[in-house]
Amino acid sequence: MEKQLQYRLGMWLAEKKHQPWVRGKNDCCTLFMEWHDIAHGTKTLKQIYGKYNDLKSAITWAKKIPLDKWFPEHGYKQVEDLQDGDIVQVQHDRRFSSGYIVFMGFAWGLGDNTGGITRHDLSTNVPHTIWRYANGS
């Protein structure tokens, strides 16, 4: 990740720190799509923003946009090592995935009913997939 983009990611995460979790507007899926749009000048977030507001409708949308297909379609490749800017996909029991953004050795994400963005240790044994933006690099 270029230093300028890395700086921008850090500043953006700091801004997100105190924004409340709101399903469909500021959650685990909107987080990585919003960052993708900022980093790459796209408008992917609009396809889900505000279109679900409870767990049932979130799962319905997750089925329409499976992340294991979304990432490759938007220029990402699966990798094994972690770098700033990567997105960690964690599959949950309820048939949907969460996305966390890697920055400074931690995964940053928005969980259900959290007060804002939270930091997660990457050394746990939680099954996950790492995606790195490959277009243009």
Each PLM stretch: what is its role?
Residues D54-R119:
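...with weaker cross-activation on analogous glycine-rich loops/strands in unrelated enzymes
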Residues T118-S137:
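Glycine- and charge-enriched low-complexity intrinsically disordered segments
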Residues M1-W61:
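N-terminal capping segments
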Residues I48-K51, G99, P127-R132:
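Intrinsically disordered, low-complexity N-terminal regions enriched in serine/proline/glycine
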